[in-house]
């Protein structure tokens, strides 16, 4: 392993990313979390944060540190990631990025897009448009001013919809024209993708959701609501949390309805993740269990019996 190399390990939700980390040698690497919800404090169960045992086995960064009311952006993540990589390298360890937020991995590999800042007045204006005219109006407006960005975005990703319009209203230039590839800070990247069949993923997602419920997800959700967290809380955008906003605001939704919706949304998200990851070049794809020895050898150059 060259000293300047970093490692990416990514894959869809429930593929088994955390499980392979228990097999990593102690004190040879540190993990940089690549998950936009696990960064938040208090939002623990549905975000599938690494267990205490796993974090004791191998050090994790960017987990459970951010106030749920704070927005976490690509720019913040990118800046923190650069700093942490330097710190890990100073310890003569391997920086390993692990997670499922494909958008973050893309820009770690390709470089950070140089989009402009926008004023608070523009942000307020776009928020007012959302409040007065609704998401459908924002989508229609985005399609008119930036069809490239419109076709790229998840139509439920209200944060990036707003951000795209903010940049356009601020500059008169579509955000898609700003987001050209920059030079990445990282030149020597080992990219490992984890995959399973969709049938296997669907089963594992269902099992995981049942485990979350048995671990106290409902109590966690009620506790979050009691603290005043709501639909305006950035952490509530995560799957497994966002669906409970319906449960709170619309009594016609039963708990079983919400669980079914979480299952559905989780599987659709896993499919979107795989579609996005498939567009990233130079990925070495492995099954997280069948190919575990190969993964360990590739990263650490060690043989291990499983």
From Swiss-Prot:
Family listed: Belongs to the IPP transferase family.
EC number: 2.5.1.75
InterPro entries registered for this protein in UniProt: Dimethylallyltransferase, IPT, P-loop_NTPase
Classification via NCBIfam families: miaA (TIGR00174)
GO molecular function annotation: ATP binding; tRNA dimethylallyltransferase activity
Protein name in UniProt: tRNA dimethylallyltransferase
Enzyme class, broadest EC rank: transferase
Catalytic activity: adenosine(37) in tRNA + dimethylallyl diphosphate = N(6)-dimethylallyladenosine(37) in tRNA + diphosphate
Keyword tRNA-binding carried by entry: no
């Amino acid at each position: 392993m060259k000293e300047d190399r970093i490692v990416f390990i990514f894959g869809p939700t429930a593929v088994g990313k955390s499980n392979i980390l228990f097999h990593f040698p102690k004190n040879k690497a540190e993990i940089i979390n690549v998950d936009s919800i696990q960064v938040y404090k208090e939002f623990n169960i549905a975000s599938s944060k690494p267990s205490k045992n796993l974090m004791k086995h191998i050090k994790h960064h960017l987990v459970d540190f951010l106030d749920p009311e704070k927005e976490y952006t690509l720019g913040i993540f990118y800046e923190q990631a650069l700093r942490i990589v330097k710190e890990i390298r100073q310890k003569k360890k391997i920086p390993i990025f692990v997670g499922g937020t494909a958008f973050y991995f893309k820009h770690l590999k390709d470089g950070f897009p140089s989009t402009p800042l926008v004023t608070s007045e523009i942000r307020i204006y776009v928020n007012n448009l959302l409040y007065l005219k609704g998401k459908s109006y924002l989508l229609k407006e985005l399609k008119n001013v930036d069809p490239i960005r419109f076709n790229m975005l998840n139509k439920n990703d209200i944060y990036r919809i707003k951000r795209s319009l903010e940049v356009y209203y601020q500059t008169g230039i579509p955000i898609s024209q700003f987001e050209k590839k920059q030079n990445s800070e990282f030149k020597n990247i080992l990219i490992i993708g984890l995959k399973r069949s969709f049938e296997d993923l669907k089963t594992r997602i269902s099992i995981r959701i049942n485990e979350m419920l048995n671990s106290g997800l409902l109590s966690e959700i009620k506790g979050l609501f009691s603290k005043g967290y709501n639909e305006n809380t950035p952490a509530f955008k995560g799957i497994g949390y966002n669906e409970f906003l319906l449960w709170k605001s619309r009594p016609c939704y039963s708990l079983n309805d919400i669980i079914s919706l979480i299952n559905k949304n989780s599987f659709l998200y896993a499919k979107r993740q795989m579609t996005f990851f498939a567009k990233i070049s130079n990925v070495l794809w492995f099954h997280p269990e069948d190919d575990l020895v190969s993964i360990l050898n590739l990263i650490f150059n060690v043989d291990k019996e499983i």
